[in-house]
Every structure is written in C-alpha cells, then in structure tokens.
C-alpha cells in the first residue's frame, strides 16, 4: 500500500513573488519517493512598498477600500503572478497566463461588487480572496509541476 502524504505550503513557504517555489519542488520530489503526495497551497506573498505582504492582507485592504467606493486595482497581484509565471515552461506559459487572468478577473469582479454594494463581506469577500489566492495559486503550481515533469 502506498503511503499518502498531505503537505501544506503557506505563503511564507512560497515566499515573496514565489521566490521559494524551487525549494518546494525539491521538497515534494523528496517526499514522493515511496509515497503519493497531495500538496495544498496558500496565497503567496509579495513585496508592496518595500515590505513583504500576504495576498490575503492586500485583498482585504482592497475590499475595505472598494467598500468605501475606491475602484479596485489588482496590479500588484498580477505583477507577482507574472514573476511566478517565469517558473512555468514555455509549453504551458500562455495557458497558465490565461488562467491567472481569468481568476484575477473573478477577484476584480467580486471587489467591484463590493464597491457597488458598499459591502465587502460574506460571499463577495470569499470570491475576492479565493480567486486571487489559494485557488489560483493551486492552479499555477499545477502548471509549474507539469513544467518540472511532476504529476
């Protein structure tokens, strides 16, 4: 019977703009010797105004500002994912970029809903956070794994 290992990699493990992803790949390759590995990923970190910040904190701030009527801009998140995209092989880059754009658009729409309704809570907040963080990062990591021949 094959062992099953579940490994969770939080934002700190992923690093700012995906800097530590190569270490995660090494770790997973090591873990999968004689075991099946299920990897779970949190939202990554990024650098904002010279400080390391979590995507979660940035999206919560964007949501709070949207609630007050500010038009949401996800440029910093997109820039961070573009840096992470460099870890995806050219075979999958365009497809992965489309996935990133699609998820970030869903997050932007949720933030725009918050702006229009004046409320950033519940389902709107969940959509904004999930589509910019954990769900998207899991998709991006899948492309990185494919690029590395990891299944």
Briefly describe each language-model feature range.
Residues 1-151:
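Nucleotide/pyrophosphate-binding catalytic subdomain
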